[in-house]
Amino acid sequence: YNMKHNEKNGWENTDGDNNGNSWNCGAEGATDDPEIEGLRRRMVKNAFATLMCSRGPAMFFAGDEFCNTQFGNNNSYCQDNITSWLDWNRLEEYKEIHDFFRYMIRLRKDNAILRKTTKPAACKLPEISIHNGFPWNGGTDNNSRLIGIMYAGRDENDIRDDIVFYCMNAYWETLIMQLPELPMGMQWKVCVNTFLPYEDGKNVEEQTEFYYKKSLKVPPRTVMILIAEENQ
Protein backbone atom coordinates (compact mmCIF):
# COMPACT_ATOMS: atom_id res chain seq x y z
CA TYR A 1 0.00 0.00 0.00
CA ASN A 2 1.08 3.56 -0.71
CA MET A 3 -1.27 4.98 1.90
CA LYS A 4 -3.24 3.93 4.94
CA HIS A 5 -6.74 2.49 4.56
CA ASN A 6 -8.50 3.06 7.86
CA GLU A 7 -11.92 3.84 6.36
CA LYS A 8 -13.66 1.06 8.31
CA ASN A 9 -12.56 2.59 11.62
CA GLY A 10 -15.31 5.20 11.32
CA TRP A 11 -13.14 8.33 11.29
CA GLU A 12 -13.14 8.92 7.52
CA ASN A 13 -9.54 7.70 7.34
CA THR A 14 -8.28 10.59 9.52
CA ASP A 15 -6.92 8.34 12.29
CA GLY A 16 -3.58 6.57 12.24
CA ASP A 17 -0.14 7.68 11.11
CA ASN A 18 0.12 9.38 7.71
CA ASN A 19 3.88 8.86 7.40
CA GLY A 20 4.13 5.19 6.54
CA ASN A 21 6.87 5.69 3.92
CA SER A 22 5.48 2.64 2.13
CA TRP A 23 5.41 1.68 -1.54
CA ASN A 24 2.91 -0.62 -3.23
CA CYS A 25 5.34 -1.61 -6.04
CA GLY A 26 2.83 -0.64 -8.72
CA ALA A 27 -0.67 -1.49 -7.51
CA GLU A 28 -2.68 -0.53 -4.44
CA GLY A 29 -3.78 -3.54 -2.44
CA ALA A 30 -4.03 -7.15 -3.57
CA THR A 31 -2.91 -7.93 -7.12
CA ASP A 32 -2.51 -10.93 -9.40
CA ASP A 33 0.38 -9.31 -11.30
CA PRO A 34 3.31 -11.72 -10.82
CA GLU A 35 5.97 -9.02 -11.32
CA ILE A 36 4.46 -6.76 -8.67
CA GLU A 37 3.97 -9.66 -6.27
CA GLY A 38 7.53 -10.84 -6.84
CA LEU A 39 8.95 -7.38 -6.20
CA ARG A 40 6.89 -7.03 -3.04
CA ARG A 41 8.27 -10.28 -1.69
CA ARG A 42 11.80 -9.20 -2.50
CA MET A 43 11.28 -5.90 -0.69
CA VAL A 44 9.97 -7.77 2.37
CA LYS A 45 13.14 -9.89 2.32
CA ASN A 46 15.28 -6.77 1.92
CA ALA A 47 13.67 -5.14 4.95
CA PHE A 48 14.02 -8.22 7.13
CA ALA A 49 17.60 -8.91 6.07
CA THR A 50 18.43 -5.31 7.00
CA LEU A 51 16.74 -5.73 10.38
CA MET A 52 18.67 -8.92 11.07
CA CYS A 53 21.94 -7.11 10.30
CA SER A 54 21.16 -4.30 12.75
CA ARG A 55 22.50 -3.96 16.29
CA GLY A 56 20.26 -4.20 19.32
CA PRO A 57 16.96 -6.04 19.87
CA ALA A 58 15.37 -6.95 16.53
CA MET A 59 11.61 -6.39 16.58
CA PHE A 60 8.98 -7.00 13.92
CA PHE A 61 5.20 -7.35 13.86
CA ALA A 62 3.56 -10.73 14.32
CA GLY A 63 2.43 -11.79 10.88
CA ASP A 64 5.30 -10.15 9.01
CA GLU A 65 6.63 -13.66 8.45
CA PHE A 66 3.69 -14.36 6.12
CA CYS A 67 3.12 -10.85 4.71
CA ASN A 68 0.21 -9.83 6.90
CA THR A 69 -1.07 -6.45 5.67
CA GLN A 70 -4.25 -5.73 7.70
CA PHE A 71 -5.62 -4.60 4.31
CA GLY A 72 -3.75 -1.32 4.70
CA ASN A 73 -5.23 -0.50 8.12
CA ASN A 74 -2.48 0.88 10.38
CA ASN A 75 -4.73 1.57 13.39
CA SER A 76 -6.80 -1.58 13.84
CA TYR A 77 -7.55 -1.12 17.56
CA CYS A 78 -11.30 -1.28 16.91
CA GLN A 79 -11.26 -4.13 14.40
CA ASP A 80 -11.88 -7.44 16.16
CA ASN A 81 -12.22 -9.24 12.83
CA ILE A 82 -10.13 -10.43 9.88
CA THR A 83 -8.51 -7.00 9.67
CA SER A 84 -6.54 -7.53 12.89
CA TRP A 85 -6.62 -11.32 13.19
CA LEU A 86 -3.61 -13.34 12.10
CA ASP A 87 -4.53 -15.72 9.29
CA TRP A 88 -2.13 -18.63 9.78
CA ASN A 89 -3.33 -20.17 6.52
CA ARG A 90 -1.12 -17.58 4.82
CA LEU A 91 1.91 -19.57 5.97
CA GLU A 92 1.34 -21.94 3.07
CA GLU A 93 0.95 -19.17 0.48
CA TYR A 94 3.97 -17.28 1.82
CA LYS A 95 6.20 -20.23 2.70
CA GLU A 96 8.97 -18.45 0.80
CA ILE A 97 8.88 -15.51 3.21
CA HIS A 98 8.57 -17.71 6.30
CA ASP A 99 11.56 -19.81 5.22
CA PHE A 100 13.60 -16.66 4.62
CA PHE A 101 12.72 -15.25 8.04
CA ARG A 102 13.82 -18.48 9.71
CA TYR A 103 17.08 -18.53 7.77
CA MET A 104 17.91 -14.90 8.59
CA ILE A 105 17.18 -15.41 12.29
CA ARG A 106 19.55 -18.38 12.29
CA LEU A 107 22.18 -16.37 10.41
CA ARG A 108 21.93 -13.63 13.04
CA LYS A 109 22.28 -16.15 15.86
CA ASP A 110 25.30 -17.77 14.21
CA ASN A 111 27.14 -14.46 13.73
CA ALA A 112 27.28 -12.58 17.01
CA ILE A 113 28.97 -9.58 15.38
CA LEU A 114 25.61 -8.72 13.78
CA ARG A 115 23.94 -8.50 17.19
CA LYS A 116 26.48 -6.90 19.48
CA THR A 117 30.02 -5.73 20.05
CA THR A 118 32.47 -8.61 20.44
CA LYS A 119 36.21 -8.80 21.04
CA PRO A 120 38.21 -7.01 18.30
CA ALA A 121 39.06 -9.10 15.25
CA ALA A 122 42.54 -10.64 15.31
CA CYS A 123 42.98 -9.52 11.68
CA LYS A 124 42.70 -5.88 12.89
CA LEU A 125 39.68 -5.03 10.72
CA PRO A 126 37.47 -2.38 12.38
CA GLU A 127 34.30 -3.47 14.12
CA ILE A 128 32.05 -1.62 11.65
CA SER A 129 33.04 0.05 8.39
CA ILE A 130 31.04 1.63 5.54
CA HIS A 131 31.86 1.01 1.89
CA ASN A 132 29.90 3.21 -0.53
CA GLY A 133 30.57 1.33 -3.75
CA PHE A 134 34.33 1.22 -3.14
CA PRO A 135 36.28 -0.29 -0.23
CA TRP A 136 36.69 2.11 2.71
CA ASN A 137 34.76 4.88 0.96
CA GLY A 138 32.42 5.79 3.78
CA GLY A 139 30.84 8.87 2.25
CA THR A 140 27.06 8.74 1.80
CA ASP A 141 24.50 11.30 0.69
CA ASN A 142 20.84 11.51 -0.28
CA ASN A 143 21.69 10.35 -3.81
CA SER A 144 23.42 7.17 -2.67
CA ARG A 145 21.78 4.03 -4.02
CA LEU A 146 24.38 1.47 -2.98
CA ILE A 147 25.87 0.86 0.43
CA GLY A 148 28.03 -1.81 1.98
CA ILE A 149 28.62 -2.36 5.69
CA MET A 150 31.28 -4.72 7.01
CA TYR A 151 31.21 -6.13 10.54
CA ALA A 152 34.32 -7.73 12.04
CA GLY A 153 35.08 -9.20 15.46
CA ARG A 154 35.79 -12.45 17.29
CA ASP A 155 33.11 -15.09 17.39
CA GLU A 156 31.36 -15.84 20.68
CA ASN A 157 33.75 -18.71 21.47
CA ASP A 158 36.81 -16.55 20.69
CA ILE A 159 38.01 -19.16 18.19
CA ARG A 160 37.96 -17.27 14.90
CA ASP A 161 37.23 -13.90 13.36
CA ASP A 162 33.60 -13.29 12.44
CA ILE A 163 33.44 -11.10 9.30
CA VAL A 164 30.15 -10.24 7.57
CA PHE A 165 29.52 -7.90 4.63
CA TYR A 166 26.02 -6.47 4.09
CA CYS A 167 25.23 -4.79 0.78
CA MET A 168 22.05 -3.07 -0.41
CA ASN A 169 21.24 -1.75 -3.88
CA ALA A 170 18.19 0.52 -3.62
CA TYR A 171 18.37 1.47 -7.32
CA TRP A 172 16.27 -0.03 -10.13
CA GLU A 173 19.35 -1.09 -12.11
CA THR A 174 22.28 -3.38 -11.33
CA LEU A 175 25.18 -1.64 -9.57
CA ILE A 176 28.76 -2.73 -8.87
CA MET A 177 30.18 -3.04 -5.36
CA GLN A 178 33.95 -3.33 -5.01
CA LEU A 179 34.57 -5.75 -2.16
CA PRO A 180 37.11 -5.05 0.60
CA GLU A 181 40.09 -7.38 0.63
CA LEU A 182 40.01 -10.14 3.22
CA PRO A 183 42.91 -11.43 5.34
CA MET A 184 45.07 -14.08 3.67
CA GLY A 185 43.46 -17.50 3.59
CA MET A 186 39.88 -16.22 3.70
CA GLN A 187 37.28 -15.93 0.95
CA TRP A 188 33.88 -14.28 0.67
CA LYS A 189 30.87 -16.56 0.54
CA VAL A 190 27.50 -15.27 -0.64
CA CYS A 191 24.90 -16.45 1.85
CA VAL A 192 22.00 -14.12 1.02
CA ASN A 193 20.83 -12.82 -2.35
CA THR A 194 17.23 -11.62 -2.23
CA PHE A 195 17.11 -11.40 -6.03
CA LEU A 196 17.32 -15.18 -6.43
CA PRO A 197 14.04 -16.96 -7.24
CA TYR A 198 12.59 -19.14 -4.52
CA GLU A 199 12.57 -22.87 -5.14
CA ASP A 200 10.11 -24.73 -2.95
CA GLY A 201 11.75 -27.62 -1.16
CA LYS A 202 15.23 -26.22 -1.58
CA ASN A 203 16.91 -24.83 1.51
CA VAL A 204 18.10 -21.26 1.35
CA GLU A 205 21.54 -22.48 2.42
CA GLU A 206 21.84 -24.57 -0.75
CA GLN A 207 21.94 -21.36 -2.79
CA THR A 208 25.12 -20.13 -1.09
CA GLU A 209 28.32 -20.01 -3.08
CA PHE A 210 31.94 -18.88 -2.75
CA TYR A 211 32.72 -15.64 -4.54
CA TYR A 212 36.19 -15.19 -5.99
CA LYS A 213 35.89 -11.85 -7.79
CA LYS A 214 36.89 -8.47 -6.38
CA SER A 215 33.67 -6.80 -7.48
CA LEU A 216 30.09 -7.81 -6.86
CA LYS A 217 27.20 -7.21 -9.27
CA VAL A 218 24.27 -6.31 -7.05
CA PRO A 219 20.91 -6.74 -8.84
CA PRO A 220 18.21 -4.04 -8.68
CA ARG A 221 16.51 -3.50 -5.32
CA THR A 222 18.44 -6.33 -3.72
CA VAL A 223 20.22 -7.13 -0.47
CA MET A 224 23.24 -9.42 -0.54
CA ILE A 225 25.12 -10.71 2.50
CA LEU A 226 28.56 -12.29 2.36
CA ILE A 227 30.45 -14.09 5.11
CA ALA A 228 34.22 -14.59 5.24
CA GLU A 229 35.26 -18.23 5.46
CA GLU A 230 38.52 -20.11 5.11
CA ASN A 231 39.52 -21.01 1.56
CA GLN A 232 38.44 -24.43 0.39
Model-flagged regions — what are they?
Residues 31-45, 50-60, 64-232:
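Carbohydrate-interacting/catalytic domains
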Residues 1-36:
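Alpha-amylase-like alpha-glycosidases and glucanotransferases acting on alpha-linked glucans and related
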